[in-house]
A protein has these predicted regions:
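Conserved Helicase C-terminal RecA-like lobe
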Residues: 1, 7, 11-138, 143-149
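SF2 helicase/translocase ATPase core recognition
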Residues: 1-4, 140-178
Length: 178
């Protein structure tokens, strides 16, 4: 439904809102449980001329998306082998699903920490050393750790969400092994 609405908006208004549409389409599969997708179509002056909305997916509180189930299973397997998991999530702003994933993982019995942008770049390595000593999983946006940090204690890397910046992806992937 969202895809068809966006195609209609492109036909009607051109490509001015492709950036917002791209972000919405990339994040919607993971955030559809939490957020209705609402994309404003703006004209050249910035005036909103239309809005495209996709409804929030109605799940019972205990229901998980298949991707969430797979993450829990992977973390369980890695923990059984004494391996910590570094879980990268691209959309940590207006479509942040870290709180939901942290709750799901904690309810499954894992110790989870989440690094966010409020930790100053020069203090991130110390924050990680101090706060993840007993953690099983670290949730983080790859932009926060793409350069200058060694995350050797997290040998398993999961790109739960992938953006479109290949440089960030490659840099973040190398944090655990260099």
């Amino acid at each position: 439904k969202l895809e068809n609405s966006l195609k209609g908006a492109i036909k009607a208004y051109g490509t001015r809102s492709l950036s917002a549409m791209l972000q919405a389409l990339l994040s919607n599969p993971d955030s559809c449980v939490l957020y209705p997708e609402c994309i404003e179509i703006k004209d050249k002056t910035g005036m909103v001329v239309d809005t495209v909305t996709a409804p929030r997916l109605a799940l019972a509180p205990e229901e998980l998306l298949p991707k969430e189930i797979e993450l829990v299973n992977l973390v369980r397997k890695e923990k059984s082998e004494s391996r910590k998991v570094l879980c990268y999530m691209t959309f940590t702003g207006t479509r942040d699903i870290r709180p939901r994933l942290q709750k799901i993982l904690e309810e499954a019995g894992f110790r989870v920490k989440s690094l966010d942008a409020s930790v100053e770049p020069k203090k991130r390595e110390a924050w990680i050393a101090k706060n993840t000593r007993d953690a099983d999983v670290l949730l983080v946006n790859p932009e926060l750790v793409k350069t200058g940090l060694d995350l050797y204690e997290f040998p398993t890397v999961v790109f739960y969400q992938v953006g479109y910046n290949v440089f960030t992806l490659r840099q973040a992937a190398r944090r655990s092994w260099r």
